[in-house]
């Protein structure tokens, strides 16, 4: 995504205001940095977005905040189990209903997570690529729509 887009972006201001409120209340940041607002605005407007940002550039917020603003479950697919664990832990400490499913997740915990998904009490689910592949192999429950996805 370029810093200066040649395409007009029509994002309702109330959507970005809500996103800024979530940013302040949940993550403790005063405002977005760099291209975060533009990327989040695109996602909130229902469009695809590609953000190539440096390490520490705030990529995670670009998919976490839309998942918290929009209804439904946010699904993040990642091959990095340690990063998933760190992000889920941080989100949980901030009061976000987040969980992860990876090759280390026990059967009982997996069942609890699927029940939370079914009840609609989970905001974000981090899923390892291996667990995603295994879910298709064994016919695990399908994640209900609507779903906001990250790391795509």
Positions of predicted regions on the chain:
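ASCE RecA-like P-loop NTPase motor cores
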Residues: 2-9, 41, 89, 93, ...
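Short, high-confidence coil segments that cap the C-terminus of an alpha-helix
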Residues: 46-49, 71, 122, 146
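Conserved catalytic network of the ASCE P-loop NTPase/AAA+ motor domain
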Residues: 67-69, 91-93, 115-120, 140-146
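Conserved nucleic-acid-binding Ia/Ib motif block in the N-terminal RecA-like helicase ATPase lobe
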Residues: 20, 74-76, 81-134
């Amino acid at each position: 995504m370029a810093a200066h887009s040649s395409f007009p972006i029509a994002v309702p201001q109330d959507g970005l205001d809500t996103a800024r409120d979530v940013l302040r209340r949940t993550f403790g940041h005063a405002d977005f940095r760099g291209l975060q607002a533009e990327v989040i605005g695109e996602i909130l407007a229902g469009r695809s977005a590609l953000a190539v940002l440096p390490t520490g550039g705030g990529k995670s917020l670009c998919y976490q905040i839309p998942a918290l603003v929009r209804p439904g479950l946010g699904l993040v697919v990642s091959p990095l189990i340690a990063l998933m664990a760190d992000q889920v832990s941080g989100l949980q400490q901030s009061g976000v209903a987040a969980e992860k499913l990876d090759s280390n997740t026990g059967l009982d915990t997996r069942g609890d997570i699927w029940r939370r998904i079914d009840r609609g009490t989970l905001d974000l689910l981090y899923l390892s690529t291996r667990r995603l592949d295994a879910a298709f192999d064994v016919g695990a429950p399908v994640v209900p729509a609507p779903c906001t996805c990250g790391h795509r």
